[in-house]
Amino acid sequence: MTLFADTLKKYLETKNTTIYTISKISGVNRTMIQHMKVGKRMPANAADVSAIAKAMMLNPSETADLLRAYHISHMGEENYFRRENVSKIISSFYDMNAASELIIPTGMQDNLEMCEPLKAINGKANINRILKAILEIEANKKTGHIKIMVQPEYTYLFDCLTSIDFNRNQTLVEAIIVFDKNEGHKSTTYNLNILQKLVPILFQCEVFHPYYVYDNVDTLFNNTSMLPFKIITSDYVLAVSYEQDKAVLYNSPDMVVLTSDTFQKKFSVANPICHTFHPTPEEYLQASFMSDDEIQAEEVYELFYQPCFPSFCPENILMDRLNTAIIPKEMQQVIAAYFAKIRAQYSNHFISFTLEGLNLFMETGRVTEIPDFMYTYLKPQQRLILLKNIITSVDDGSFKPRIVRSDKLSVPSPLCICAPNEQKVIIYYFSPNKGQYIFHLQELSLVHAFHDFLVYLPESSMVYSEEESKKLLHSIYDKYTNIYC
């Protein structure tokens, strides 16, 4: 029996109706519904599930439950939960725009007085106070270095990394995090949750460098583990229990050396989770340009807030809008040649984008994937030319658009995700407060999860169909033609 069959059977038994009545109202074949109930068949699509739910008079919560069971049974638990978690990570980038200012370390370290080399601490509040104090002490040093061996379960530590200003003195913060090596959706979900916890820190703490090793997470970290979380500074070692209610603070040079050696041994076999940086204009162009092999790949999957407008931009408009004060003439020619290559291969690119992003471009001329300082917003007539070029490419079959349903997937305005192949995923993000960021995912389970999501997206219910997307593009073109002409 599938989860969908079990869920359908549950509602059939609790609702005062018959399969015959449900079939008549929903239009779904009665025999098909009977086969669904015993797990022999699956609905042809989500629309049939919604029709059955309506016929059974399920409330919104029950309808969502039945649809969720359908999607899990249709695509498999691991695929469902992996894709659900990737969509949550994508949507969570919204929170970055509201990131608060960092706190400059204060004199809280004055509360940390130790005469003995070690001190047992009980209670979360006391441990949190000590943790914050030793982090602030290190952040106030000119050559501070913090080494961390923790998991995302230690929420308060992760909160400290997004609130204390470690950037001021360039305090190096290195973290080793265990990724679950087991197969199945629980491990995949756990590893994706790690990335979701790290994203805010990577935005706020420029000196934070997370690394991963593979192991069995449940075995290493549980309520019987002996103080598994370690925070090491120049002067202190704080060892904390899994439940974060017991800890030992060491104020001993020998203990600092011992635990630092242990950290270093793990560090020698660890790898970066991702490479994150603020690019200069040259770095941005280098990072955003795909190689010839990537451009010519059989399939390239991308998710943008807007369509990839530069690829549909005639050279005369491109040169008119580029900021020539900061982009040398030879680089301008390189940019024009690059986008000409992209245009020639666009039939192999599967791009999903939002209606909101398209409307923003048509109203303002802003291209969110390009930093504002690199160009001048496009004029109304130039916007119409680009949209017309997109429509022409859609009509002749050289471009396959998919417009995202914003009620199904939230895509932040400055976000671009590109997967030129199964081994490479790059996330571009522009923060109004922090500027341009580039996230180059390194850990393979994360790379595979994002690549799988981008491949799945164009055929999912999170986007309009190709025909619906075409109609929307034509209607937007007609709307703004009437406004600007």
Which ranges hold each PLM region?
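Hydrophobic protein-protein interaction segments
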Residues: 117-466, 473
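Conserved hydrophobic/aromatic packing and binding residues within compact polymer-binding modules
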Residues: 8, 22-23, 33-36
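Short amphipathic recognition helices of helix-turn-helix/homeodomain-type DNA-binding modules
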Residues: 47-50, 54-107
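A short, Lys/Arg-rich alpha-helix, primarily the initiator
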Residues: 1-21
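Recognition helix of helix-turn-helix/homeodomain-like DNA-binding domains
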Residues: 27-44, 51-54, 68-71
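Alpha-helical residues within the helix-turn-helix
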Residues: 13, 24, 54
